[in-house]
């Protein structure tokens, strides 16, 4: 019998060795090495948490918050170090999305078979 958790652990280990993940780690190291980029990342991270919390609680963002996020996004878009990290992050998520499609394929096939019954 297959232990799917062993397979999942191996997949996690394999992910760490992919070109996409290694590029992300390198980009993160570049952010850490640049004080301004790191501070901007931390500000962006806090802002994203604030937005998610507002969405989860159904609260509207204030005009002041919206202006802050707009300004923050403009500063992030001008920071090439952070932009490189965000592009690398996107590549990792694309890879994970592709893997998720493969993992979900048996379930999709089972439901497709049920629909045909």
Curated annotation (Swiss-Prot):
SUPFAM superfamilies registered for this protein in UniProt: YheA/YmcA-like
Record's Gene3D superfamilies?
YheA/YmcA-like
Q: Which InterPro entries did the record assign?
A: Com_YlbF, YheA/YmcA-like_dom_sf
What's a Pfam family in this record?
Com_YlbF
Q: Which family does it belong to?
A: Belongs to the UPF0342 family.
Name of the molecule in the record: UPF0342 protein Ldb1541
**What organism, scientifically named, is this protein from?**
Lactobacillus delbrueckii subsp. bulgaricus (strain ATCC 11842 / DSM 20081 / BCRC 10696 / JCM 1002 / NBRC 13953 / NCIMB 11778 / NCTC 12712 / WDCM 00102 / Lb 14)
């Amino acid at each position: 019998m297959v232990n799917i958790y062993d397979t999942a652990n191996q997949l996690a280990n394999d992910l760490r060795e992919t070109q996409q993940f290694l590029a992300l780690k390198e980009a993160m190291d570049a952010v850490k090495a640049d004080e301004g980029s790191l501070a901007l990342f931390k500000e962006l991270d806090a802002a994203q948490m604030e937005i998610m919390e507002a969405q989860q609680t159904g609260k509207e963002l204030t005009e002041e918050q919206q202006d802050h996020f707009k300004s923050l996004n403009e500063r992030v878009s001008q920071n090439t170090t952070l932009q490189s990290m965000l592009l690398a992050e996107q590549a990792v998520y694309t890879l994970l999305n592709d893997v998720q499609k493969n993992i979900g394929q048996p379930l999709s096939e089972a439901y497709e078979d049920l629909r045909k019954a």
